[in-house]
Amino acid sequence: MAESGAGYRVELAKTGRAECKGTVCGRSKIGKGDLRFGTFVDVGKFQSWKWRHWGCVTERVLRNVNKKFEGDIKNCLDGFNELNDPIVQEKILRAFEQGHVDEEDEERCRKMASDASEEKDRKIEEGELTSEEEKEPIQDLRKSHKRKSVEKSSVPNKKHKAERKRSPSPKIEILEDDEEIEDVASDKDEEEKPWSGDEEDDDELVVKDSEDETEGVSTIASQRPRRSARRKVDYAESGNEYSDSD
């Protein structure tokens, strides 16, 4: 079937289980007996037909199929000769000639999308949410989920931002007892107390000791023998010449 039609086929739907792959109808189910257009898909081990309503067939698909079959739709399009209704056959040929499906077929598919959306809303409102008590928990759940997602997005990434270490705060000691206050005051008085005469005596003793040490050193130096002075020679009287070797 795929070989004869080169991967394209038209037929009346045998069941109502197939879902339309087009977007005009909002991917609604193709009803039994509705005209549908199929594309054969061969992906390795899997081979299948992808169906869409005739009103969901786009201008691009019609143009590509007509180009591939070189305008011979009657003999090349698979399933065309199996259609017993001449009105349906004429509709197909007219679409390939004008480059788009009839407006009524496209409008019918748009209505399917609108009806499907309204039916879905009706089931949600009347089927699942029949009372205000059931609506409120779901609304609260949506709000809490949204709030959690916002909080999660606001948390900084620990991998990219280093943690800052807090420096320890200085400890402050509070003296509440009078005894501790007096001890602190006495310590300050001792630190600021001026030096007395006794301390001066101690300094004088240290100075005297240092003077004694220096005197001892000087006596030792004075005990060393002094060099005798060179005797002066009067060269004029002796008649000898002056020489440094003497």
UniProtKB/Swiss-Prot annotation:
Residues 175-184, 197-215 have a biased composition (Acidic residues). The modification Phosphothreonine is found at T130. Residues 157-168 have a biased composition (Basic residues). It is found in: Nucleus; Mitochondrion. InterPro entries: Znf_PARP, Znf_PARP_sf. One of its GO terms (molecular function) is DNA binding. The modification Phosphoserine is found at S131, S243, S245. Keywords: DNA-binding, Metal-binding, Mitochondrion, Nucleus, Phosphoprotein, Zinc, Zinc-finger. Residues 103-126, 185-196 have a biased composition (Basic and acidic residues). GO terms for cellular component: mitochondrion; nucleus. This is PARP-type zinc finger-containing protein C2A9.07c.
